[in-house]
């Protein structure tokens, strides 16, 4: 069983989605299926088949979210030392091949948003950097090949998960 590290924010987000699916979406789709069933022949009833497909999606998502929750390892990144790259660390790195600087915060997979600089602990970048210290150089496999990155800084700052 693989533990899924995440912040309390990520855990609450998954729990809220699961609650919405179980308490709102699931009952609504049952009603939609009943209404569509009343429209006659099920073999050629597009509404019925669409509702059943939606029901399969909802049930599969409920299973997925339940599994994530059961494997969740809620971590308070503010309570961790950030002298080495770890969950919740914000890191500044320098691509030694092109002198470009990047800043990322390592979060759980359900919280990641690369466009906002939030990368999953399971991403190739995070995997290559976790456990390293300021000044270390890491080779990271990128889609266009391998590049060397120097860790310029490691620190903790409150993670902004702005949902907008």
Curated annotation (Swiss-Prot):
GO terms for biological process: DNA-templated transcription elongation; regulation of DNA-templated transcription elongation. Keywords: DNA-binding, Transcription, Transcription regulation. InterPro entries: GreA/GreB_C_sf, TF_GreA/GreB_CS, Tscrpt_elong_fac_GreA, Tscrpt_elong_fac_GreA/B, Tscrpt_elong_fac_GreA/B_C, Tscrpt_elong_fac_GreA/B_fam, Tscrpt_elong_fac_GreA/B_N, Tscrpt_elong_fac_GreA/B_N_sf. The keyword Metal-binding does not apply. GO terms for molecular function: DNA binding; RNA polymerase binding. It comes from the Bacteria. Signal peptide: none annotated. The keyword Oxidoreductase does not apply. Pfam families: GreA_GreB, GreA_GreB_N. Necessary for efficient RNA polymerase transcription elongation past template-encoded arresting sites. The arresting sites in DNA have the property of trapping a certain fraction of elongating RNA polymerases that pass through, resulting in locked ternary complexes. Cleavage of the nascent transcript by cleavage factors such as GreA or GreB allows the resumption of elongation from the new 3'terminus. GreA releases sequences of 2 to 3 nucleotides. Belongs to the GreA/GreB family. This is Transcription elongation factor GreA. It comes from Helicobacter acinonychis (strain Sheeba). The gene is greA.
């Amino acid at each position: 069983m693989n533990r899924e590290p995440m912040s309390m924010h990520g855990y609450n987000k998954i729990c809220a989605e699961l609650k919405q699916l179980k308490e709102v979406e699931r009952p609504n789709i049952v009603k939609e299926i009943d209404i569509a069933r009343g429209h006659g022949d099920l073999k050629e009833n597009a509404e019925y088949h669409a509702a059943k497909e939606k029901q399969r999606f909802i049930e599969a998502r409920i299973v997925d979210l339940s599994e994530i929750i059961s494997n969740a390892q809620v971590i308070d990144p503010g309570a961790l030392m950030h002298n080495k790259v770890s969950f919740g660390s914000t890191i500044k790195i320098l691509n030694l091949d092109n002198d470009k600087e990047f800043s990322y915060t390592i979060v759980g997979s359900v919280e990641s948003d690369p466009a906002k600089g939030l990368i999953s602990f399971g991403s190739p970048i995070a995997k290559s950097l976790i456990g390293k210290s300021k000044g270390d150089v890491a080779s990271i496999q990128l889609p266009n090949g391998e590049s060397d990155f120097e860790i310029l800084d490691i620190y903790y700052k409150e993670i902004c998960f702005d949902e907008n």
